[in-house]
Amino acid sequence: MSPEQDTSPELTHFRDGLPRMVDVTEKAATLRTATAEGWVRLPPEARAALEGGTSPKGDPLTVARLGGLAGSKRTADLVLLCHPIPVTGADVRVTLEKAGVRIVATVRTTAPTGVEMEALTAVSVAALNVYDMLKAASKAIEITGVRLLSKTGGKSGDYTAPDT
């Protein structure tokens, strides 16, 4: 296949087979947003502890929301090749639904690189906090479905997950 026919995406974090941080020096700082979601599936005993307010550590949903906000700001410390960028806005919604705890995080920046990883990290850290807060009630809690719902801005353009 000739280079002009190659439609595979470029993996920008590798050069000559070695990891690298992508150079964004020449990229324009523009408004970028990303929204991610994830779920925490609760066994009956964990759900009962949440609904009954009997978690010994306090309100799991409030702690998860705060953890998600903190996670969005600490992404570059956790995701090794992620740029430390200014998070100019973050919203983490944590709701108890029939299927479990749903977490949706939206993160905004005006930077030369996107905030998809910040949104995904916010959801993941929020979910881990739900687990931590309810693990005394059940160890069978499951974190699932962490994914990017949408992104705007940047060279790659806008994205919306097909089933949203």
Curated annotation (Swiss-Prot):
SUPFAM superfamilies noted in UniProt: Molybdenum cofactor biosynthesis protein C, MoaC (SSF55040)
Top EC group: lyase
Keywords of the record: Lyase, Molybdenum cofactor biosynthesis
Molecular function GO terms recorded: cyclic pyranopterin monophosphate synthase activity
Pathway it works in: Cofactor biosynthesis; molybdopterin biosynthesis
Binding site for substrate: 81-83, 117-118
Enzyme Commission designation: 4.6.1.17
Catalysis: reaction(s): (8S)-3',8-cyclo-7,8-dihydroguanosine 5'-triphosphate = cyclic pyranopterin phosphate + diphosphate
InterPro entries noted in UniProt: MoaC, MoaC_bact/euk, MoaC_sf, Mopterin_CF_biosynth-C_dom
Any single GO BP term: Mo-molybdopterin cofactor biosynthetic process
Residues annotated as the enzyme's active site: 132
Record text on subunit structure and interactions: Homohexamer; trimer of dimers.
Role, per record: Catalyzes the conversion of (8S)-3',8-cyclo-7,8-dihydroguanosine 5'-triphosphate to cyclic pyranopterin monophosphate (cPMP).
Membership in a protein family: Belongs to the MoaC family.
Family annotation (HAMAP family): MoaC_B (MF_01224_B)
Protein name: Cyclic pyranopterin monophosphate synthase
Gene name for this UniProt entry: moaC
